[in-house]
Amino acid sequence: MRTQLSDIQRMKDRGERLVMVTAYDYTSAQLVDRTDIPLILVGDSLGMVIQGNSSTVPVTIDEMVYHTKAVMRGSSKALVVGDLPFLSYTSPEQAIQNAGKLMQIGGCGAVKLEGGVNLAPTVRRLVDLGIPVMGHLGFTPQSVNQIGMRVQGKTVAHARQLLDDALALEAAGAFAIVLELIPAALAKAITARLHIPTIGIGAGVGCDGEVQVWHDILGLYSDHLPRHTKRYADLGSTIEQALTQYAHEVRERSFPTAANSSVIDANTLAEALGEQTVSVGASAKVAV
């Protein structure tokens, strides 16, 4: 049975840590489905780890729908949250249209958007229409050209603003909030003041849960590993070794072998090629 919004709130109420990970396709979603991870984020981070862009800004709503559909085909247990990408929710009306597309066509169970007090009216409109919304505060990747990639909330004014933003999102009906790249003590304080769950990334252990990028934790991304993540496997090296071995065996003609091939009756092949058929007692099968 798929994770429900009520399950997420119940986990916070019980003090059970929430686990969330990104997934971008059918295969990664299937692998998550083999675990007990209750939340999948189809993040616009795909712009970087899938498309090779330097930020999430170029990602479009149609691309998000495409990847969300693929994830939904591979997932049967997790609550799947789809990102609304840059400039896809500049007005409540546009947000409704694109969030609706992400849920109706993509199939996800909720959407995520970046912003605080300024986005609260949009969040309220979405929630009133039955669209579950996850907020996102702190470092907001879609604003990277304005704020840069650095820790947020380190001044009195900014810390207060983040708290106000979180309270506004909760009041507007958001079911959870991602807190990214903010001081751990501030994230813990915000979490304590909210009734809804917080999910951290680079925000310390005081949040109600954690989200990490698939490629980072599995060692698939060769670029610099951010301080706020941890590599749990080195699949990049494993894949490189496998590809190198595959290429070697193909060049040395040790792959494919007879076990990897099909056979055809020798006389059938000879007749098809207009050649003399084999004599009785000769090998009746030819590998192809």
Swiss-Prot record:
Q: In which pathway does it act?
A: Cofactor biosynthesis; (R)-pantothenate biosynthesis; (R)-pantoate from 3-methyl-2-oxobutanoate: step 1/2
Predominant location category? cytoplasm
| Name this protein carries in UniProt | 3-methyl-2-oxobutanoate hydroxymethyltransferase
Q: Which InterPro entries does the record associate with it?
A: Pantoate_hydroxy_MeTrfase (IPR003700), Pyrv/PenolPyrv_kinase-like_dom (IPR015813), Pyrv_kinase-like_dom_sf (IPR040442)
**Catalysed reactions, as listed in the record:** 3-methyl-2-oxobutanoate + (6R)-5,10-methylene-5,6,7,8-tetrahydrofolate + H2O = 2-dehydropantoate + (6S)-5,6,7,8-tetrahydrofolate
| GO annotation, cellular component aspect | cytoplasm
What is the active site of this protein?
E180 (proton acceptor)
Q: Which residues bind 3-methyl-2-oxobutanoate?
A: D44, S45, D83, K112
Subunit details for this protein? Homodecamer; pentamer of dimers.
